[in-house]
């Protein structure tokens, strides 16, 4: 069996290479367990001063979870007693990483999505290359942005946070630096030079001092931010998404369907679980007041609900397995959504709009 996770120690830096290029490094259960095993070993190794997450393919850092494997072996496997076993283990890994005792560095390139973001977003230093396509597309799969990433999405301006969280649209390297999701934006040709400096610095420094020295070196390679899709369309994002309810977002889009930008997003949102869209809309505001660990715990609760009622099964089947893009959602429109159920799931008494209007 091919090693999808390859650990390597270079002087005092432990490197975890993701090595499943055929699936764009999509994470399966064995990969998640292997990463945890390596990290625990290195955390207790005095010779290791820092850990680097990297990929052996330029096409992706990590495209998220292996959805086909997840669907077959967990969601549709009646023998599996714990259908949430994959997520519970993955989320515990992400919480462990968030509290890791040694400096963590991540190399974002190509596709960076879902579980790959969860694996790396709490790194002490994130290096982004120009090829990055960063996104949390979970609403198209019958659930919501998970692995604690809404803790970060909630820090974005309201309109952009909904654009990313509800519509699942991506961010580019310049966006990631601009909104403090990544620390440096470099040309791919400079990456090895920066890592060589990391290796040299790890011989002298450790902990926070090592990261501060690495940040100084990184500034030498930091590229000027470029105009991105988000920049070019920011006025439209504000116009359609800077709203106090999902109903208002829909209304704004409906009134501007002659705009191709609005039409495309409107059609996408209408094809998704309206219940989960309402959950994500409210979750954006809720996560502003939660810690990362609390956000992860909430994510697991929402995912368990999505598994129990079949929303995730239908979403993955539609988008990944059968590719008919018809998820058979019970809630065909916002009017079908029981907001009491949304509030109960999130543990809130009032929606954002209800709280705002008090």
What positions do the PLM features span?
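Hydrophobic/aromatic residues within transmembrane alpha-helices
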Residues: 53, 66, 119-120, 175-176, ...
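Conserved CoA-thioester-binding segment of acyl-CoA-metabolizing enzymes
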Residues: 1-54, 95-96, 356-358
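Glycine- (often His-adjacent) and acidic-residue-rich active-site loop
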Residues: 55-89, 345
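Glycine-rich phosphate-binding loop at the start of an alpha helix
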Residues: 84-87, 91, 114, 170, ...
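Short, flexible helix-coil linker/hinge segments at the edges of structured domains or between repeats
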Residues: 75, 79-83, 127-130, 135-159, ...
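C-terminal alpha-helix plus adjacent terminal tail
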Residues: 2-6, 189-199, 203-358
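Contiguous mid-protein beta-loop-alpha structural module that forms a pocket-lining wall or clamp
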Residues: 148, 155-209
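Glycine-rich beta-to-alpha active-site loop
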Residues: 97-141, 164, 168, 173, ...
């Amino acid at each position: 069996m091919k090693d999808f996770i390859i650990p390597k120690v270079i002087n005092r830096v432990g490197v975890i290479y993701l090595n499943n290029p055929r699936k764009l490094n999509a994470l399966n259960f064995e990969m998640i367990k292997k990463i945890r095993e390596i990290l625990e070993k290195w955390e207790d190794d005095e010779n290791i001063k820092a850990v680097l997450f990297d990929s052996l393919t330029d096409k992706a850092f990590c495209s998220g979870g292996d959805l086909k494997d997840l669907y077959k072996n967990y969601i549709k496997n009646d023998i599996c007693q714990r259908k949430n076993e994959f997520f519970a283990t993955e989320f515990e890994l992400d919480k462990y990483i968030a509290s890791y005792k040694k400096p963590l560095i991540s190399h974002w390139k190509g596709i960076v999505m879902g579980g790959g973001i969860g694996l790396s977003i709490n790194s002490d230093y994130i290096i982004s290359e120009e090829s990055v396509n960063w996104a949390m597309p979970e609403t198209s799969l019958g659930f919501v942005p998970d692995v604690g990433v809404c803790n970060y999405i909630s820090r974005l301006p309201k309109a952009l946070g909904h654009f990313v969280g509800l519509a699942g649209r991506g961010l580019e390297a310049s966006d990631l630096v601009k909104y403090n999701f990544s620390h440096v934006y470099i040309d791919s040709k400079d990456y090895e030079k920066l890592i060589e400096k990391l290796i040299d610095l790890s011989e002298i420094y450790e902990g926070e001092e090592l990261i501060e020295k690495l940040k100084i070196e990184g500034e030498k390679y930091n590229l000027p931010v470029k105009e991105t899709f988000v920049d070019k369309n920011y006025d439209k994002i504000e116009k359609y998404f800077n709203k106090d309810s999902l109903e208002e977002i829909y209304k704004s889009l409906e009134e501007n369907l002659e705009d191709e930008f609005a039409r495309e997003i409107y059609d996408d949102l209408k094809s998704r679980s309206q219940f989960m869209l309402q959950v994500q809309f409210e979750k954006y505001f809720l996560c502003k007041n939660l810690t990362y660990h609390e956000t992860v715990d909430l994510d697991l609760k929402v995912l368990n609900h999505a598994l129990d009622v079949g929303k995730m099964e239908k979403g993955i089947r539609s988008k990944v397995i059968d590719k008919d893009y018809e998820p058979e959602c019970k809630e065909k429109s916002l009017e079908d959504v029981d907001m009491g159920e949304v509030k109960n799931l999130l543990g809130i008494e009032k929606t954002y709009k209800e709280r705002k209007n008090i």
